[in-house]
Each structure stands twice: as C-alpha cells, then as structure tokens.
C-alpha cells in the first residue's frame, strides 16, 4: 500500500470540510420554505407584516407543495425567493415570497384561479415602492416557474 503524505491528508481534510460547508449551505437553502418563514423566530414578524389585512388559506402556514429557495439580487439587496402551491391542487392557489435576511423584509404574491371563469386574481403582499417593478417581476416569475427555469435571468442592478 502507498503512503499518504501529510500534504495529501491536509488536502483530504480541506476537501471534506468544504464539502460539508457546501452541503450544509445547500440544505439550509432547501429547508427554507414559506411555512418555515411564517413560523420562524426571526422571520415570523416580517411574515405577519406581509400578510397583514389579507386572509390566506391554512395550507400557506402548514406548508404546501414548494420549490426550493433561489437567490436573486435586486440592486444591492439579496433575496431568497420561493414559491408554493395548494397541495393536490397546484393550479388553483399559489404563493411566491421574497425575503431579505439583511433587512428582514418580506414581500409576496398570492394567486387564485376562479374555477368557473378560469380568471386569475393576483394579490400583492407588502410590495413597497423600492420593489414595485423589479420585485413584482421576480415574484410573478417565481409564481409561474420562470425563475426556476431561468435562475440567472432575474437579477437586476
């Protein structure tokens, strides 16, 4: 058997640590959901402010069928963007949320489809003036799947 030099052992150790850091970071992003934002100690207040004055269905808090969070940059602010839909009926109700950990700001878009008319109703949640155009573009892209299909296409300076 060959010997492993101390340099080789160091490389293996660094590689192992790097793999764990990457896996932990990816797992943390994958674990970020709209329902976890609604219930989280540091995010609950921002979520409640976002939905204030709106009655959302229970599945939003309990957890729907969701997509993993994606990172989007608007200006100099970085956001985690995620979406979810009503379990077993994704076509009828969907929600997309943008959250900035830096400013602890949250904004969203809720969509319902009228079964009789097939018309979609969009409800904007806590969209401030700074986010009005680009933020709405990103939220709608998350809602429709465009953000997931083109993740680098929605970063705006």
Curated annotation (Swiss-Prot):
SUPFAM superfamilies to which the protein is assigned, alphabetical: Inhibitor of vertebrate lysozyme, Ivy (SSF89872)
Annotated compartments: Periplasm
UniProt entry keywords in alphabetical sequence: Disulfide bond, Periplasm, Signal
Pfam families per record: Ivy
One annotated GO molecular function: protein homodimerization activity
Signal peptide: 1-28
Keyword Lipoprotein: no
GO biological process, one term: chaperone-mediated protein folding
Important for lysozyme inhibition, annotated site positions: 88
Covalent S-S links between cysteines: 85-90
Domain of life: Bacteria
Gene3D superfamilies in UniProt: Inhibitor of vertebrate lysozyme
GO cellular component: outer membrane-bounded periplasmic space
Keyword Signal: yes
Family the UniProt entry places it in: Belongs to the ivy family.
Functional note: Strong inhibitor of lysozyme C.
Subunit composition and interactions: Homodimer.
Identification of the protein by name: Inhibitor of vertebrate lysozyme
């Amino acid at each position: 058997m060959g010997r492993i030099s101390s340099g080789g052992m160091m490389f293996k150790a660094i590689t192992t640590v790097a793999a764990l850091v990457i896996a932990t970071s990816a797992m943390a992003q994958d674990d970020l959901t709209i329902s976890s934002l609604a219930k989280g100690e540091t995010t609950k207040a921002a979520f409640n402010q976002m939905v204030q004055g709106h009655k959302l269905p229970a599945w939003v808090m309990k957890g729907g069928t969701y997509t993993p969070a994606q990172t989007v940059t608007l200006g100099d602010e970085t956001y985690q963007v995620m979406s979810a839909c009503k379990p077993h009926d994704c076509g009828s109700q969907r929600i997309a949320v943008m959250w900035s950990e830096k400013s602890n700001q949250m904004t969203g878009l809720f969509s319902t489809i009228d079964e009789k008319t097939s018309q979609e109703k969009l409800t904007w949640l806590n969209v401030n003036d700074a986010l009005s155009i680009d933020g709405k573009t990103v939220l709608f892209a998350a809602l429709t799947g465009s953000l997931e299909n083109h993740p680098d296409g929605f970063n705006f300076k």
